């Protein structure tokens, strides 16, 4: 039995979001639909989820005392991390004091950087991964590149969405990869992971939801990235039954080890029927935005249901679907969007604008979504819809 109170009253059921970007915004909307009181926290004002929350707080979530002060004042029923850059050691303490962290404080800690989750997957669970080394200094990094071999992928251990990520194709380009990882990662300079190249046919995100009734899987999501950042995704991605079964077993193993309830974005490489673990996020995944149109329960609805202990009897796929990012480039503190009617002229299309208040450089500002008779048609419709939305600075 789940009991939900009334927002802004003494009986309110409260979710506190740590991170208030576009993914957090959709979580907030789903929570609001169930009468949950939402508090949004982020490091900058007017973040997307703040625009649909009951209250907001602007603070560095790496500032442990400030984070604790907000949580003790708000007394949320659930603390829901939506990004990696959080004072996770403080979350572990708060969880021990009785504040539920989604899915668990340990999961947030292990996945806040690539080292924790890679060591769990490869060294504790014995999952197949790419070869890897960690490095703290330029000298250790160059030695790691030699050990793993060229070409190799270089990533800050604490970063996401491709920030600070590059490919070192030889010893000459390795120096530039080190410098880029030190300056472009979300958490500044620090430790990096050097990964050997994986020979794969394709990569997928397998959305895996742990809920009161067990573990469920969404249809596999294919995606394309540029410079490590998501640009388009589609669902379902075709794969053999053997590969799908192995992917689900691997996703089930790693999410069980992390524990708790909620949705996990498990990233996997597929080569024939072989499956190789890449990463996992204990929260909604950016490539999963396609589920806003592809499924009866989006990844955000699944996350909120799981958090609240509500049933998830089935996850129904409406049909082949795709998403295409709407990008802004330049500098603005009040971007606008010119939407040509052609953007939504086709049936089974939609656009979502995130409401991000500022643009500096290249930033994801929205997404176009489409259903089709097959994935290729859905992708073409999503691409066309996105092309008819122009960002004005």
Swiss-Prot record:
Its EC number is 6.3.1.21. GO terms for molecular function: ATP binding; magnesium ion binding; phosphoribosylglycinamide formyltransferase 2 activity; phosphoribosylglycinamide formyltransferase activity. GO terms for cellular component: cytosol. The keyword Phosphoprotein does not apply. The keyword Ligase applies. One of its GO terms (biological process) is 'de novo' IMP biosynthetic process. Keywords: ATP-binding, Ligase, Magnesium, Metal-binding, Nucleotide-binding, Purine biosynthesis. Residues 119-308 form the ATP-grasp domain. Mg(2+) binds at residues 267, 279. Belongs to the PurK/PurT family. This is Formate-dependent phosphoribosylglycinamide formyltransferase. The lineage of its organism: Bacteria, Pseudomonadati, Thermodesulfobacteriota, Desulfovibrionia, Desulfovibrionales.
